[in-house]
Amino acid sequence: MALLSFERKYRVRGGTLIGGDLFDFWVGPYFVGFFGVSAIFFIFLGVSLIGYAASQGPTWDPFAISINPPDLKYGLGAAPLLEGGFWQAITVCALGAFISWMLREVEISRKLGIGWHVPLAFCVPIFMFCVLQVFRPLLLGSWGHAFPYGILSHLDWVNNFGYQYLNWHYNPGHMSSVSFLFVNAMALGLHGGLILSVANPGDGDKVKTAEHENQYFRDVVGYSIGALSIHRLGLFLASNIFLTGAFGTIASGPFWTRGWPEWWGWWLDIPFWS
């Protein structure tokens, strides 16, 4: 694949965290690096384990295939392969692939001399995965509290997990997570729509400037956050979708065992309206 005119300028040595020049190369448009190699290794091994574990199951229906975590009786120990051991190995591969990909992003950022905002943002969903598959099961004392790898089985797990606490919508972490999701979608949707509107004027009109963008939002909501800050806001909102969701998830079980509607009892005791 031919390089674009400006790409060679940025394909410089250095910036690697491990391996030095040994892994400091590109394959086509893709930077490899040590963590690119480790990511490929974990992805290949994990997918192979999923395929082999599926071959030991009762069906090849892609919707019904399920790699289940160990039974609660195994606690935090290693389980036999067909009784949750595959799930444990696949989870290790998933974490290895996710973390490798994040560190590869760090190396690319170091090469370009830019901030680490992208890898730090990617850390947030990795943290959410760790909460579900590692931290919460550790606090509860068994890997069996994690979710299975499968389409329908995962949906069943989400459904059953929510009903264990009567109504998951009353979970304050879930409430906050969904609120951040909706606000983020609205904010970045408005931003994207505005950029398209100023960059695609009607026939005979000139492309508009940042001043037009700022004035539009001043007219609509009385304030414009600015072209740079809207991306900071988007990062903040998107990160908090996972962070507040992780709080609500890890609190369920280790720190709160009753239905989430009961948690709101304090609201009824506030002197103003009690």
Curated annotation (Swiss-Prot):
Q: Which residues lie on this side of the membrane: Periplasmic?
A: 54-83, 140-170, 250-274
Q: Which residues cross the membrane?
A: 33-53, 84-111, 116-139, 171-198, 226-249
Locate the residues binding Fe cation: 191, 231
Q: What are the annotated GO cellular component locations?
A: plasma membrane light-harvesting complex; plasma membrane-derived chromatophore membrane
A matching Pfam family: Photo_RC
Compartments where located: Cellular chromatophore membrane
Q: Which GO MF terms does the UniProt record name?
A: bacteriochlorophyll binding; electron transporter, transferring electrons within the cyclic electron transport pathway of photosynthesis activity; metal ion binding
> Keywords of this protein's UniProt record, alphabetized?
Bacteriochlorophyll, Chlorophyll, Chromophore, Electron transport, Iron, Magnesium, Membrane, Metal-binding, Photosynthesis, Reaction center, Transmembrane, Transmembrane helix, Transport
Q: Which residues lie on this side of the membrane: Cytoplasmic?
A: 2-32, 112-115, 199-225
Report the record's Gene Ontology biological process terms: photosynthetic electron transport in photosystem II
What is this entry's stated membrane topology?
Multi-pass membrane protein
Q: What is its main location?
A: membrane
Q: Which residues bind (7R,8Z)-bacteriochlorophyll b per the record?
A: 154, 174
Stored InterPro entries? Photo_II_D1/D2_sf, Photo_RC_L, Photo_RC_L/M, Photo_RC_L/M_CS
Positions binding a ubiquinone in this chain are: 217
Family under the similarity heading = Belongs to the reaction center PufL/M/PsbA/D family.
- What is the annotated quaternary arrangement, including any partners? Reaction center is composed of four bacteriochlorophylls, two bacteriopheophytins, two ubiquinones, one iron, and three highly hydrophobic polypeptide chains (designated L, M, and H).
Q: What does this protein do?
A: The reaction center is a membrane-bound complex that mediates the initial photochemical event in the electron transfer process of photosynthesis.
Q: What is this protein called?
A: Reaction center protein L chain
Q: Source taxonomy lineage?
A: Bacteria, Pseudomonadati, Pseudomonadota, Alphaproteobacteria, Hyphomicrobiales
